[in-house]
């Protein structure tokens, strides 16, 4: 039986303080270099690399073992730490090396399908299929460790501030609102299903009614929706709720949490209070409700300048109730040719813009397609509006308010990336407040809740719920960082009458409202306190702090872009008996696909066993 002796320290921590000491190390062989009389071994663990040295004076047995090592072998090394003759400044342990006296091979390794090092080019499918190997790479490990640091800081903050960590159920009831639920069939109640939670929203509100006052949870959530780079079917929320709290209270605690996380994880002193911007100002200045406030290039409403313009594209749009909005790109006059600008015009068509007008301002003169329509008054107004100094490209969109906002938001982000004005290593937070209670969903053709149907309207909004609900404003707030929504929250409805009016405004019938949420409305009649809360998306937050482009890079075992897991081959067909126990039968139109999947998985397993198994040896 292998005896595992106590490790002295991690490989990456063997620095000058250990010189002259005997150490016992464990790790993976990163590289072996045999120079004849000397063998150098780079030994790796989660903290980094240390160089192991074996020379001919160590004896033939040790030299033979060292020479037999392959990449990714798991070994135990004993030896003395000595000062290196040549320092390697690129390694944390570059001042020292370990003069080995014993090497024990704990396990051998086949040649991996890709090299275990940073900066390799390998497909995501291969990385996920061999995720246990991918996770050995330092940059991947550091992203997972960073996520762990966020979790630790979160637990510490909430514990220090009197919050109670309460787990809410994973198996709950389906609600057809929002994204699709993941359903779990019940064997005990055939034909009935649990739903995995999209959030613990109602449970945490009920906990406030139960008198717990301060709740938090690192909540696992599930949504069956189309995937993007920043989405996974399962994800984690930093979830909090408080009784007897207003917007400022929740925002203050959130800022305290963010301040601790930024300090503990990134070593950054976050300045608080975090600035606020209203939803309306955010839309008008940045074109979106997730403003990237790291740079300028703000959107300007130019409608007053062009309402009487001879350029009918502008004046006509304004006359039809639309707007003319624009942005100025510094040094854009030389950077962007007509061909490049035409590509931008094509780009914004996906946001329903009809076109892109533009002028350049150079050497005190305007040029470009729109320049001939500009009066002297227009020119002076534009120079003043944008504070033009020379060399700018000014682009315009004339359309409905929402189209102008969407188009210029995406253009602004594109121009910022291309012109290099986004500062590196900056984490800029902003609160977006004073949201509309409802937003119009073009696809559904009706008004829907801007956040969720349990959000409290402001005082005027409570009155508008029964008359003009689409004009109501919400007591809600989102926290945004670098143009990405980190989280959001609101004051919650705590009275039955307001909750019923909210459901009415959303088009619920009484029957539907009480079938889905009767328990909540009954609870609101049982002495429910005013309460509020917020949730932060841990995965997205970790992704941004780790400077990654994909949430999959900060999840240990993520799904791919098709919501499947190539290593375990999930999802996969199950045995007929399992389906029969649940009263489920696969429709005939899907049976060929299921059979093909079963055959493919069986073939892969058989090939794996034939090539690699020691079963019959």
Describe each model-derived feature in a short phrase.
Residues 1-617:
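Class II aminoacyl-tRNA synthetase catalytic cores and aaRS-like
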């Amino acid at each position: 039986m292998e005896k595992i002796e106590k490790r002295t320290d991690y490989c990456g921590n063997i620095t000058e303080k250990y010189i002259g000491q005997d150490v016992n190390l464990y790790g993976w062989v990163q590289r072996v270099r045999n120079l004849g009389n000397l063998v150098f071994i780079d030994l790796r663990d989660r903290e980094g690399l240390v160089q192991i040295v074996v020379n001919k004076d160590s004896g033939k047995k040790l030299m033979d073992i060292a020479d037999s090592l392959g990449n990714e072998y798991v070994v135990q090394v004993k030896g003395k730490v000595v000062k290196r003759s040549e320092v390697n400044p690129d390694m944390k342990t570059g001042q020292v090396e370990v003069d080995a006296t014993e090497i024990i091979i704990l396990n051998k390794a086949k040649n991996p399908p890709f090299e275990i090092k940073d900066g390799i080019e390998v497909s995501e499918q291969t990385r996920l299929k061999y995720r246990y190997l991918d996770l050995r790479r330092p940059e991947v490990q550091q992203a997972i460790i960073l996520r762990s640091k966020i979790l630790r800081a979160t637990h510490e903050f909430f514990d220090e501030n009197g919050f109670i960590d309460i787990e809410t159920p994973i198996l709950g009831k389906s609600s057809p609102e929002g994204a699709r639920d993941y359903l779990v069939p019940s064997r005990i109640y055939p034909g009935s299903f649990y739903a995995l939670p999209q959030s613990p929203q109602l449970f945490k509100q009920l906990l406030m009614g139960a008198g717990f006052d301060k709740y938090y949870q690192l909540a696992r959530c599930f949504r069956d929706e189309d995937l993007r780079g920043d989405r996974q079917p399962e994800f984690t929320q930093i979830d909090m709720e408080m009784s007897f709290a207003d917007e400022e209270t929740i925002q203050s605690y959130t800022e305290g949490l963010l301040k601790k996380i930024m300090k503990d994880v990134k070593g950054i002193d976050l300045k608080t209070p975090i600035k606020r911007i209203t939803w309306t100002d955010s839309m008008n200045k940045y074109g979106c409700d997730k403003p990237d406030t790291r740079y300028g290039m703000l959107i300007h409403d130019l409608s007053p300048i062009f309402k009487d313009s001879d350029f009918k594209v502008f004046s006509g749009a304004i006359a039809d109730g639309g707007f003319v909005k624009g942005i100025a790109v510094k040094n854009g006059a030389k950077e962007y040719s007509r061909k490049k600008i035409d590509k931008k015009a094509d780009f914004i068509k996906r946001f329903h813009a009809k076109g892109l007008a533009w002028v350049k301002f150079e050497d005190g003169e305007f040029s470009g397609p729109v320049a001939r329509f500009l009066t002297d008054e227009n020119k002076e107004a534009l120079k003043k509006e944008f504070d033009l100094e020379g060399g700018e490209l000014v682009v315009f969109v004339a359309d409905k308010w929402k189209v102008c906002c969407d188009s210029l938001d995406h253009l602004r982000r594109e121009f910022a990336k291309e012109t290099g004005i986004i500062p590196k290593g900056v984490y800029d937070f902003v609160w977006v407040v004073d949201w509309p209670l409802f937003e119009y969903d073009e696809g559904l053709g009706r008004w829907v809740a801007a956040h969720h149907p349990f959000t409290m309207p402001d005082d005027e909004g409570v009155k508008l719920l029964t008359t003009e609900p689409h004009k109501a404003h919400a007591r809600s707030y989102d926290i945004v960082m670098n143009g990405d929504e980190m989280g959001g929250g609101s004051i919650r409805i705590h009275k039955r009458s307001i909750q019923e009016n909210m459901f009415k405004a959303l088009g619920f019938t009484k029957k539907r409202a009480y079938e889905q949420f009767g328990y909540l409305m009954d609870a609101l009649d049982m002495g429910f306190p005013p309460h509020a809360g917020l949730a932060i998306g841990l995965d997205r937050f970790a992704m941004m702090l780790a400077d990654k482009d994909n949430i999959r890079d900060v999840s240990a075992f993520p799904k791919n872009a098709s919501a499947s897991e190539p290593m375990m081959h999930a999802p996969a067909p199950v045995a007929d008996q399992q389906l029969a126990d649940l009263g489920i039968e696969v429709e005939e139109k899907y049976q060929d696909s299921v059979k093909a999947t079963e055959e493919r998985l069986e073939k892969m397993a058989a090939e794996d066993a034939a090539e690699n198994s020691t079963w019959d040896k």
